[in-house]
């Protein structure tokens, strides 16, 4: 279920965003939103490239707590920058949801993660602690 939700949020939900909020140009917007998945190229800069229990939010350069405010600032610019900001922020949210799934499956696995405190706080607020 975790993988389904993760890929649904990455690939299908942006289509809903494009159609609902940018009806006249939804195809272009959807392509831009999908293109923001290129932010995952920062995964190639670490070793190992894939680690099953690693939360990308707060760990990878373009998923860092320094990069996320820049993505928020993009919302205040004109197209296409605001659409890029929407895509990047939604990507971070999607990855964070994935981190929550993993965190609640194995908290000790994330004890050294940069996002540990945030994951713990959000899990407590949502009442999804195990």
Predicted regions and their residues:
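N-terminal membrane-targeting hydrophobic helices
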Residues: 1-130
């Amino acid at each position: 279920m975790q993988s389904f939700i993760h890929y649904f949020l990455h690939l299908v939900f942006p289509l809903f965003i494009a159609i609902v909020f940018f009806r006249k140009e939804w195809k272009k917007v959807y392509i831009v939103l999908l293109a923001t998945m290129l932010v995952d190229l920062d995964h190639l800069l670490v070793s190992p490239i894939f680690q099953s229990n690693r939360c990308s939010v707060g760990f990878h350069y373009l998923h860092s707590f320094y990069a996320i405010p820049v993505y928020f600032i993009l919302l205040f610019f004109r197209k296409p920058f605001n659409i890029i900001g929407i895509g990047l922020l939604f990507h971070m949210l999607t990855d964070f949801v994935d981190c929550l799934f993993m965190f609640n499956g194995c908290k000790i696995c994330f004890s050294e993660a940069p996002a540990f405190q945030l994951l713990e706080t959000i899990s407590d607020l949502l009442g999804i602690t195990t």
